[in-house]
Amino acid sequence: MRSGVIAQKVGMTRVFTDAGEHVPVTVLKVDQCQVVAHRTVEKNGYVALQVGVGKAKVKNVSKAERGRFAIAKVEPKRKLAEFRVTEDALIPVGAEITADHFIPGQFVDVTGTTTGKGFAGGMKRWNFGGLRATHGVSISHRSIGSTGGRQDPGKTFKNKKMPGHLGVERVTTQNLRVVRTDPERGLILVEGAVPGVAGGWIQIRDAVKRKLPAEAPMPGKFRELADGAAPAVDAAPEAPAVEENA
């Protein structure tokens, strides 16, 4: 069982096949997704990889987290996640997992936070049918109707589907096909829709209900940075010199 990656949703577009058919795809960007720590059976009771992505401001990182990043010799990460793996799929700490960790044609499961819709009624939130348009119904056409029984049970049960907040839930969409990868730009194109807004964080892992292709790299596709050093950050360009008039 291999590790997954954390990506950022860019948006949706479409690509064309050789036969001229268009395929709707979601573009996911993997940017400096590095292994931050290992979880081992001896120390933690299970085997997993902790990966991080993005660049966090030092002022927003706690002192304890800064110490862990220093041990791993990686820059402070904005988003962290753990992926359960087998012992033969451990990737060295500090290594950067690239977009070609997944291959075109394989299926993946993606997890994200759905778009928030605010307060919603029963028809929008739960697809209720509403009440009749006429025949005695005046201003309750979109209401949910009764919420319980009569004297027995004499209450509304917990988890009854009612109006309330819609969205902002952790959702996993399974068996999305990888259409294309672009390791140079760190892009993964998956067929179909992915939960969440553009710019949201998405976790991508091998599909649990599909067999992993034999061509998939094991333990994964990654590049090790020299001496576990953090990736170089381009310095800000110097301001052009301004000549002063005498």
From Swiss-Prot:
How does it get modified post-translation? Answer: Methylated by PrmB.
Which keywords does this chain's UniProt record carry?
Methylation, Ribonucleoprotein, Ribosomal protein, RNA-binding, rRNA-binding
* GO molecular-function terms, A-Z: rRNA binding; structural constituent of ribosome
The family database entries (InterPro entries) matched by this protein are listed as: Ribosomal_uL3, Ribosomal_uL3_bac/org-type, Ribosomal_uL3_CS, Transl_B-barrel_sf
Q: Where is this region: Disordered?
A: 140-162
Hydrolase listed as a keyword: no
Please report a single Pfam family linked to this protein. Ribosomal_L3
One of the GO BP terms on file: translation
Please indicate which superkingdom the organism of origin belongs to: Bacteria
Q: Which residues carry this modification: N5-methylglutamine?
A: 151
Task: Cite a GO CC annotation.
Answer: cytosolic large ribosomal subunit
How is the quaternary structure described?
Answer: Part of the 50S ribosomal subunit. Forms a cluster with proteins L14 and L19.
Function, as annotated: One of the primary rRNA binding proteins, it binds directly near the 3'-end of the 23S rRNA, where it nucleates assembly of the 50S subunit.
Family named by the database record: Belongs to the universal ribosomal protein uL3 family.
What is this protein's record name?
A: Large ribosomal subunit protein uL3
Question: What organism is listed for this UniProt entry?
Answer: Methylobacterium sp. (strain 4-46)
The opening ranks of the lineage are: Bacteria, Pseudomonadati, Pseudomonadota, Alphaproteobacteria, Hyphomicrobiales
What is the gene name? rplC
